Amino acid sequence: MANKYVSSVLKSLLVLLHLVFLSKQHVDSASIVKSLPGFEGQLPFELETGYIGVGEEEEVQLFYYFIKSERNPKEDPLILWLTGGPGCSAISGLLFENGPLTMKLDVYNGTLPSLVSTTYSWTKTSSIIFLDQPVGTGFSYSRTQQFNKPSDSGEAKRIHEFLQKWLGKHQVFSSNPFYVAGDSYSGLVVPATVQEISKGNYECCNPPINLQGYVLGNPLTDYTTGSNSRIPFAHGMALISDELYESLKKTCKGEYTNVHPRNTQCLKFVEEFNKCTNRIFQQLILDPLCETETPDCYIYRYLLTTYWANDATVREALQINKESIGEWVRCYYSIPYNNDIKSSMPYHVNNSISGYRSLIYSGDHDFEVPYLGTQAWIRSLNYSIIDDWRPWMVKNQIAGYTRTYANKMTFATIKGGGHTAESKPEEASIMFQRWINGQPL
């Protein structure tokens, strides 16, 4: 009787161990993707997709796209790319900003949209992990309803955990120079993530991540500084009159966002400002404000991506888990999220003290996060200038302006650029390649 009981217990334990093994296999799934629906032929680069579980029970499943450098992946830098939002899929970076593929701009006719190769991919000289985060973004999901609500500071910890596990399974990249990069809202999360990785390198984690620095494009950094820069930017771009600008300066005294209710004069002029600018395309003021469904609209490609990413053959090729979220959306803006970092400037200071390099770039026609606000917070850090304001060139033409500081921070504008690198892909790529290779812009 006792033997039967022991035998029964052992069988139960074996079943449980088998289930745990399958669960771990499921959590840590990764697939090499040789071809993608919509792209003709084999992919001309190495693509891996997969999930890494984070959290106490690995309940949060973070989906990633990993593309190896086309030059020398054994030695080239490894970049982690975080798209803004929060809640915007990493596909935005991969297909529209710095990846080796993009959508072909054809009128949608009910068939699967096509993909084409790009010329100015950052993966020419760097390997990039494009990460869907926070949970609920892109193809990332939770296996239970019991998980902590994502937050800026919490994401820094989750991303660090993701990296530790990812590098544990890709140890060939553990010694590569590592950088965290992103744009827009990631201006709050990336500096915090860099600090978290740096802290982990000293306190807990072996082997340490070979962290070298970070890259940020048009980064949200400080809510007040960023918002207050919109009015001087609008004046400089001839979107408002001299008279309105002078009235705003006089009555608001530089505070255009959190205006006191009793300051009725300021509120009146702010309303006039809004009337002058509310029909401007915020992300690139030179482009028309148009409907997504219009094929000649700049953002029509986003609609095509939605059709592509929701196709069953695409999901199968990417090896998307069936228990993942249902419909894929490029940006899930209603994602439950706690915006608990109001300013990332203290993180920039700490990262500078730790000696990390940084590249901060701004498209100079972005109205969402104007370059003036970015210049203002960088200036407030009060680091000495070692290479003063000068043009940087592409093909003997001015591509933007740059300045380098003693804390290893390089600031650059991209002339004619918008909120993301997709508006000026050649200039953005050349800027990145020069900086990542340690060359002056």
UniProtKB/Swiss-Prot annotation:
Q: Kindly list every residue the record annotates as glycosylated.
A: N109, N350, N382
Listed disulfide bonds for this chain?
A: C88-C331, C252-C266, C290-C297
Give one Pfam family, short name only.
Peptidase_S10
EC numbers listed for it are 3.4.16.-
Tissue expression per record: Expressed in seedlings and roots.
Q: Which Gene3D superfamilies match?
A: alpha/beta hydrolase
> Can you provide one Gene Ontology molecular function annotated for this UniProt record?
serine-type carboxypeptidase activity
Which top EC class is given? hydrolase
**Chief location:** secreted
Q: Say which family it is in.
A: Belongs to the peptidase S10 family.
Q: What is the official name of this protein in its record?
A: Serine carboxypeptidase-like 1
